[in-house]
Amino acid sequence: NILKGDKTGIVEPSRDHILIGKERHDIGRPNNEGYPIRGIFKGDYLYLKNFKIDRWPAGNPETGYLNSDGGPTKTAILDTYGTADKKYWEMSFGKRPEEELYNIKTDPLCMNNLAVNEEFKAKKDELLNQMKAELTAQKDPRILGNGDVFDNYRTFPPKFMNYHNRFMDGEEMPKLH
């Protein structure tokens, strides 16, 4: 058993990776839409597939990037927008590419996206194919082409439904915390 055993590292050879996914996590996008991601950690690599790259990953700017809690760090990063140090804003709140690949051993903060580097195409394709095969076997709607079903599930209390749309219409909104 991997939880109760004395061994470290890869204890069971079939358990050499982790699949990850995200759909809806905040109320700061139009029509309660999510930011769907699927990914796989394996060996030294993290591969991410961003499915709706036209959307803001941390929530829309006009509602305050609601997928990121307020605080001094968020404020400091937001203050870099429009400056020479804008890279911190881009990494935290900017739109993401369709594919991301990171070597988590040499780049644990995931700052250097290798997906655009031809040298890593084989690794990217290997991870993508394994991820898709496993998620297909699990009948993941996103991988099977019906991922928009996730945007139709009611996941927020009624007072927060359609928050973005109501905010943009000038409605006084309930406090978030």
Residue ranges and their predicted role:
Residues 1-100:
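C-terminal cap/loop subdomain of S1 sulfatases and analogous C-terminal strand-loop tails that border
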Residues 83-99, 104-110, 114-177:
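Long, internal low-complexity/basic segments
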